[in-house]
Regions:
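Bacterial N-terminal signal peptides that target proteins for export
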Residues: 1-10
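Short nucleic-acid-contacting surface segments enriched for D/E, G, S/T with interspersed K/R
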Residues: 80-95
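Cleavable N-terminal signal peptides
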Residues: 11-12, 22
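OB-fold/S1-family single-stranded nucleic acid-binding modules
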Residues: 101-124
Length: 125
C-alpha cells in the first residue's frame, strides 16, 4: 500500500512540474507590457508554426540593417481571422506595434501590425 502511495505521489509531482512549465511558456514575463513601441522594417522570414507565429524582420539603423524577431499568437487563432502561411512574405514592408522584451533584445510581442498601411487583424489568446 505504501508503494502505491509513493507511485501516485510521484505521478502527481511529475504532472505538477509539467503543468508549471506549460503555464510559464505562455506568460508574457519576458515582455514589458507597460510600454508600447512602434518599429518599421522589412520582413526577412515568416514562420507560420506552433506554438507561436514568428516574424523576422530587418530594421534600418545607424549601422545598417538590424535583425529583429516578433511573436504572435498561434496559427490556429490567426487562421480564424484570415491569416495563412502566405499572409506575410520576405520583402514586405511592415510597421509593428507591440511590447519589447525587458532585456532590450531585438524582440517584440506584436499587438498590431500594418502591411502596406493596411492593418492586419490579430486574434488574441
Amino acid at each position: 500500500m505504501k508503494s502505491k502511495a509513493l507511485i501516485v505521489l510521484g505521478i502527481a509531482l511529475c504532472l505538477l512540474a509539467v503543468s508549471a512549465s506549460i503555464f510559464a511558456h505562455h506568460g508574457a514575463a519576458a515582455y514589458d507590457m507597460t510600454k508600447t513601441v512602434t518599429i518599421k522594417g522589412k520582413v526577412t522570414h515568416f514562420n507560420f508554426v506552433n506554438p507561436h507565429v514568428q516574424v523576422f524582420f530587418a530594421v534600418t539603423g545607424d549601422k545598417g540593417p538590424e535583425p529583429w524577431q516578433a511573436e504572435l499568437t498561434s496559427p490556429n487563432h490567426l487562421v480564424r481571422t484570415g491569416w495563412s502561411k502566405d499572409t506575410l512574405k520576405s520583402g514586405d514592408d511592415v510597421t509593428i506595434t507591440g511590447y519589447r522584451t525587458k532585456d532590450g533584445t531585438n524582440s517584440i510581442w506584436i499587438a498590431k501590425i500594418l502591411l502596406k498601411d493596411q492593418e492586419l487583424i490579430l486574434a488574441t489568446e
